Regions:
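Short beta-strand/loop motif that positions the catalytic acidic residue
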Residues: 231-232, 237-240
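Acidic beta-to-alpha connecting loop that harbors the catalytic carboxylate
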Residues: 242-244, 270-271
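Conserved alpha/beta-hydrolase "acid-adjacent" motif
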Residues: 245-251, 275
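Short beta-strand element of the alpha/beta-hydrolase
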Residues: 70, 80-91
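Primarily recognizes the serine-hydrolase "nucleophile elbow" in alpha/beta-hydrolase
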Residues: 148-213
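N-terminal cap/lid segment of alpha/beta-hydrolase-fold proteins
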Residues: 33-78
């Protein structure tokens, strides 16, 4: 499968693997939308957690789309605050939704951070098993647009400093984020957790397309590294697990190589769920430093043991 994918990529991107400006702009046009369209934000309720307010909301990315469930986590005060868009993984049902990073967002709020936590299309029950591969292309484009609209919503808040915005995504939340951020480029820092270089790497675990060759051709404009390469003047933290059966060490090298500097790659004694305290502590420290909220940033890696 990877050999076939490589052939497609070379045909589309040329020998260097990097798209020229005109080629990328043609791809970016797939994700255009009307920024003036009403997001139709509706609030279902608000919960106070200490001094932090957690707003339960829905918004409509584009006219006719299904509303997206989200939380907005807001600290006490007028701001301006840093802002972060968080997007969950596809994994355990309990956390395959907007709650995955909620505790982190609440803990970070008093330090000066507004968070928007949204649900992706993969939050639907048995989303992966029910997918129709021939619909992946259209659904992927809609998902990227929905993430761009989520960024619109976050930045529309008068208490959010547009110059201090970040993005955190795990698994599909990171991979669709790579596309959205490569087109959007409004964030100052990114954290991508347990991601691979191509959506195609995870496309064939269940239902198979009628024609794999046709599937690869259709989805070639969605190659994640094309979008990673577009982001300049921003920092990126990649977090990976040493026991991840879905992400190889070679995968981590590919995405790390596609990102611009400054960038950092960290590994943890975890599986794909990345549910270890050090991973959360590191990304929170990264966000605080990169978004101007203080703190020393990532702790240094331990020195190798002497032989």
């Amino acid at each position: 499968m990877r050999a076939a994918l490589l052939a497609v990529l070379l045909a589309v991107a040329g020998p260097t693997g990097a798209l020229c400006a005109d080629e990328f702009e043609a791809q970016a046009a797939l994700f255009r939308y009307d920024p003036a369209a009403d997001l139709k934000v509706e609030e279902a309720g608000v919960e106070k957690q200490g001094t932090v307010s957690v707003h339960d909301i829905r918004f409509t990315p584009v006219p006719g789309a299904e509303p997206v469930k989200a939380y907005i986590v807001v600290p006490e005060g007028k701001g301006p605050f840093a802002g972060v868009l968080w997007v969950h993984w596809l994994g355990e049902p309990a956390t395959t939704n907007r709650t995955q990073f909620l505790k982190e967002a609440v803990d970070l709020a008093p330090k000066g951070m507004v968070s928007l936590l949204v649900e992706g299309m993969w939050s639907a029950p048995d989303w992966y098993g029910k997918r129709v591969p021939e619909q992946d292309y259209d659904h992927s484009i809609r998902q990227v647009v929905a993430l761009r609209r989520a960024m619109d919503l976050l930045l529309s808040r008068p208490d959010v400093d547009k110059a201090r915005v970040g993005y955190v995504g795990h698994d599909y939340g990171g991979m669709y984020g790579m596309m959205a951020n490569g087109v959007d480029r409004r964030a100052r820092t990114y954290v991508y957790i347990a991601v691979v270089p191509s959506l195609n790497d995870w496309a064939f675990f269940a239902r198979q397309p009628v024609s794999k060759a046709a599937y690869l051709r259709q989805n070639a404009p969605l190659e994640l590294t094309d979008y990673l390469r577009q982001v300049k003047n921003a920092s990126t933290l990649f977090q990976f697990a040493n026991k991840d059966v879905y992400v190889s060490r070679a995968d981590t090298q590919v995405v790390m190589g596609a990102a611009s500097t400054p960038k950092e790659r960290r590994f943890y004694e975890a599986d794909h769920g990345m549910a270890v305290p050090q991973a959360a502590a590191d990304r929170d420290a990264w966000l605080l430093k990169e978004l101007g909220l203080g703190g020393p940033g990532l702790p240094p890696l331990p020195s190798p043991s002497p032989r």
